[in-house]
Amino acid sequence: MHSVRRLASVFADAVRIYYDDGGCPLCGRETSGGHICTGCETALDAARLPENAFVLRRQHESGDIRNAGKEPEPLDCFSFYAYESDAVRKLLFYLKKYPDRRTAKELAARLCEILPDSRKADRTLYVNIPRSAAGMRKYGFDQAALLASTAARLLDRSGTWAKGGTKAAVPAVYFADLLAVRPFGKVQKALTARERAANKSGRLYVRPFFRHLPWVPRHIVITDDVITTGSSVLAAAETLRGYFPNAEISALSLAVVTRFRFDEPLEDLLN
């Protein structure tokens, strides 16, 4: 009964957001078309990162037998905002709670701006970090999947390429909900950086339907709403490399935590 009530609530929220013409998603002020208001936009602009690209790498723990002698591959990442801003936190909270496609389209367009051209076409696959089971039960949707699918749809409108010279068009940019998470893990929010990495290690897997992709991807963009310690995107990249060894993999997020209190400062990981 609780799940039915929750589903009805999510559906009602989606209908309200879709047909509501006014209201900034962050502060509730009336705006034309329900876009982000000028004041909140100014606050978000102040939180925009001066450098959107960085490399994420994590060294293995000493004594880790599973990865002995194996150097972890670095991951190219692209983020738009710094998480520490109050406006960014409000925006992320809103995205976690409401499946607002209008706001997601606006934000996905910004994410597309910071991506290099190689990640925008030519058999590029967008993959989301799967939301936790608790989050899916509570809100009924995956905010990272919404961002990733919207970005892929925006980029694919720029053109398609014809397969074998026939009239049948194949999308150059494609979204697939490929990744799933195994159960019985700990809640990430309460863990340190090392604990997060251990919690995610081996828990992500690729769903069987990946064989039905329109092509073998040349580029894979792992999309999430926020990168905190980087354990999720690194675990996703490691899993995807096992299935697509020749693909160029990178990560894309709306925000990144530039300072976080855990075992190792995040600045040591973002270098």
Please describe what each predicted stretch is.
Residues 1-271:
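Glycine-rich phosphate/pyrophosphate-handling loop used in enzymes and phosphotransfer proteins
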